Amino acid sequence: MRDVIKLVSSAGTGHCYYTTKNKRTMTEKMQMKKYDPIARKHVIFTEGKISKGGGK
């Protein structure tokens, strides 16, 4: 089963990407090198928690 995960920038800009991963085959936290438009360079994005809040 594929679960939605959030990739958070390690540059500390607050920028994030959302993607899916198969938890059965990838049990460790995902890390990817992607472009951060706020920092204007490629940085490592690590898997973070998705908040379940309703906005209030």
From Swiss-Prot:
Q: Which UniProt keyword terms apply here? A: Ribonucleoprotein, Ribosomal protein
State the source organism's domain of life.
Bacteria
Record's SUPFAM superfamilies?
Answer: Zn-binding ribosomal proteins
GO molecular function annotations of the record: structural constituent of ribosome
| Listed InterPro entries | Ribosomal_bL33, Ribosomal_bL33_CS, Ribosomal_bL33_sf, Ribosomal_zn-bd
Instruction: Fetch the NCBIfam families from UniProt.
Output: PRK00595.1, rpmG_bact
Q: Which PANTHER family match?
A: 54S RIBOSOMAL PROTEIN L39, MITOCHONDRIAL, LARGE RIBOSOMAL SUBUNIT PROTEIN BL33M
Q: What is this protein called?
A: Large ribosomal subunit protein bL33C
What is the gene name? rpmG3
